[in-house]
């Protein structure tokens, strides 16, 4: 289980990324995770499985409240959580099998009506004899109040744009759990892995009376899919029964869409969000090196692959020893973090050799390396190949310490031009931002001629040693290989001086740190001292 947004606050082996930071949990067993949010990490996060397609349903909100006695920087009356997810009419195993079969082509699954959740099996139509059906979510609010709306991007695949009928004055106050200066917007846009907090001030009773209604549609639409799906929820006011405009709204989608949401999504809030407080943004002269991660889809007779710079990584096949991306044999060795605890610096590639010969990537372990204290510009590039499947957008996510988001644009990345755009602007700290597509794939890259068709730039100040994932957060793309692993720091920094003898139960597959119905796990508590201090 991954604690999305709080990776840097986890105990060793608690990041939840199997084969990177821990052994997988055996069926029928369980594992105690330990996290300790730090002051300054209050915000909107979520948890989800990090295995296969499980995160489409094994996920939920994770809200870190302010330290006792401290108030949020912006006043509001109440808050609501909007957790956006997707429903597929196939099982997880069906989806994974189709993604990994030879010559498979990833397509959008058909949109489903609201009442198709009432099914005896997840891949059949509902029983028409069922009395109850699943209608839109109803979000209750009171008139003339300010609400903090916490929106969490839990979809597997889709980027979602959403608007609120007759409520277009929204103010972003936080992104990915970090407070920002207030930024006005008329709609919200969110992809897998992202979180946005915004303020919504509800209408007064007089305003509701003039409008003649007390319920308003929340309209959500997917983008960049062969079939863009529209979904709805309701913003419903609690109003006195004696008011003439008090009404009952039919819980079926409206025949006519109440809002017209734009198709253009790639410029939403770009170079707009700024941190509420200074965040230590390192300027270009502090950058030590640049790493380019190219997102592309590759086709071989074995199947279709979502790759990073012509390489793939999954929890079942780490492609160690420079094995090609199309090799399908299961190749799951010792998890990298476990190996570092066992063998120390011998389990970490030589930094100088890796950087000088391979741009920071080690072909033997299929990992990237970084030194604590260095500043790295990470440039994600979108390269279509002119084939029908070869072009998509990607929500890139980083575990561990978060990044400064330097913006995005079409074509190839130009560092000089982007630095000009950054003048007078302080980038925010994020953990998930979008690598967009700016043109339909059929118009570029003919005959498998890969060309740059979009970029996203990050600046990472390496301060959190560990074994961390950097990957596309689209679940389908993760299954197809669009993931990377980074070793940040040396062995003593990563292990923090903890001896392997005290962690033996974590270092073996099915060790005694994993419990089951017969026995409780033997847990090494890493934050006991800190928790005692807090309680005092």
Swiss-Prot record:
Q: What does this protein do?
A: Multicopper oxidase; part of the gene cluster that mediates the biosynthesis of terrein, a fungal metabolite with ecological, antimicrobial, antiproliferative, and antioxidative activities. The first step in the pathway is performed by the polyketide synthase terA that produces 4-hydroxy-6-methylpyranon (4-HMP), orsellinic acid (OA), and 2,3-dehydro-6-hydroxymellein (2,3-dehydro-6-HM) by condensing acetyl-CoA with two, three, or four malonyl-CoA units, respectively. 4-HMP and OA are not pathway intermediates, but are rather shunt or side products.
Residues at which Cu cation 1 binds? 2
Which pathway is it part of? Secondary metabolite biosynthesis
Residues that hold Cu cation 3 according to the record: 50
Q: Is Lyase one of the keywords? A: no
Task: List the Gene Ontology MF annotations in alphabetical order.
Answer: copper ion binding; oxidoreductase activity
Q: Which residues form a coiled coil?
A: none
EC id? 1.-.-.-
Supply the alphabetized keyword list: Copper, Metal-binding, Oxidoreductase, Repeat
Cross-referenced NCBIfam families: ascorbOXfungal (TIGR03390)
> Which segments constitute the Plastocyanin-like domain?
1-67, 79-238, 354-488
What Pfam family is a match for this entry?
Answer: Cu-oxidase_2
Q: How is it used?
A: Terrein shows anticancer activity on various tumors including cervical carcinoma, ovarian cancer, and head and neck cancer. The secondary metabolite acts as angiogenesis inhibitors through the inhibition of angiogenin secretion. Terrein also has anti-inflammatory activity. It shows an alleviative function of age-related inflammation characterized as an anti-oxidant and might therefore be a useful nutraceutical compound for anti-aging. Terrein may enhance osseointegration by decreasing the level of ROS and has a potentially synergistic effect on osteoblast differentiation.
- Upregulating conditions: Expression is under the control of the terrein cluster-specific transcription factor terR.
- Record-given protein name: Multicopper oxidase terE
Give the binding site residues for Cu cation 4: 397
Q: Which residues bind Cu cation 2?
A: 4, 48
Q: Which organism is it from?
A: Aspergillus terreus (strain NIH 2624 / FGSC A1156)
């Amino acid at each position: 289980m991954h604690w999305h947004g709080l990776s840097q606050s986890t105990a060793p082996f608690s990041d939840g990324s199997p084969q990177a930071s821990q052994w997988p949990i055996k069926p029928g067993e369980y594992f105690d995770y330990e996290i300790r949010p730090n002051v300054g990490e209050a915000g909107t996060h979520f948890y989800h499985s990090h295995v296969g397609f499980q995160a489409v349903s094994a996920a939920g909100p994770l809200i870190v409240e302010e330290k006792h006695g401290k108030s949020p920087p912006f006043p509001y009356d109440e808050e609501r959580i909007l957790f956006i997810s997707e429903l597929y009419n196939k099982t997880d195993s069906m989806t994974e099998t189709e993604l990994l079969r030879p010559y498979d082509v990833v397509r959008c699954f058909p949109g489903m009506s609201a009442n198709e959740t009432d099914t005896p099996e997840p891949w059949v139509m509902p029983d028409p004899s069922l009395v109850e059906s699943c209608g839109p979510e109803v979000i209750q609010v009171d008139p003339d109040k300010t609400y903090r709306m916490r929106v969490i991007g839990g979809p597997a695949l889709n980027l979602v744009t959403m608007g609120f009928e007759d409520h277009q004055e929204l103010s972003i106050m936080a992104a990915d759990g970090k407070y920002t200066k207030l930024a006005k917007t008329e709609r919200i846009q969110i992809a897998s892995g992202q979180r946005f907090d915004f303020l919504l001030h509800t209408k007064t009773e007089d305003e509701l009376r003039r409008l003649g209604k007390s319920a308003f549609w929340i309209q959500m639409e997917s983008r960049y899919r062969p079939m863009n799906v529209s979904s709805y929820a309701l913003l419903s006011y609690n109003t006195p029964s004696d008011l003439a405009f008090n009404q009952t709204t039919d819980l079926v989608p409206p025949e006519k869409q109440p809002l017209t949401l734009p198709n253009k999504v790639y410029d939403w809030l770009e170079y707009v969000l700024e941190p509420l407080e200074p965040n230590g943004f390192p300027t270009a002269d502090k950058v030590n090196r640049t790493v380019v991660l190219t997102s592309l889809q590759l086709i071989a007779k074995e199947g279709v692959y979502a790759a990073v710079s012509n390489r793939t990584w999954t929890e079942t096949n780490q492609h160690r020893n420079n094995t090609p991306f199309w090799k399908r044999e299961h190749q799951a060795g010792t998890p990298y973090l476990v190996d570092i605890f066992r063998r120390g610096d011998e389990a970490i590639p030589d930094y100088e050799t890796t950087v000088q010969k391979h741009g920071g990537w080690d072909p033997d372990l299929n990992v990237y390396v970084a030194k604590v204290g260095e500043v790295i510009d990470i440039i994600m590039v979108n390269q279509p190949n002119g084939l029908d499947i070869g072009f998509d957008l990607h929500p890139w996510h980083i575990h561990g310490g978060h990044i400064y988001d330097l913006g995005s644009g079409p074509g190839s990345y130009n560092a000089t031009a982007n630095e000009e755009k950054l003048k007078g602007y302080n980038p925010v700290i994020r953990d998930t931002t979008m690598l967009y597509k700016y043109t339909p794939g059929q118009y570029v890259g003919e005959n498998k001629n890969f060309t740059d068709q979009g970029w996203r730039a990050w600046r990472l100040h390496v301060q959190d040693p560990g074994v961390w994932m950097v990957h596309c957060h689209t679940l389908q793309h993760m299954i197809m290989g669009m993931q990377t692993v980074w070793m940040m720091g040396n062995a003593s920094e990563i292990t923090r001086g903890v001896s392997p003898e005290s962690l033996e139960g974590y270092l073996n597959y099915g060790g005694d740190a994993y419990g089951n119905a017969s026995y409780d796990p033997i847990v090494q508590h890493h934050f006991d001292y800190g928790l005692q201090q807090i309680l005092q």
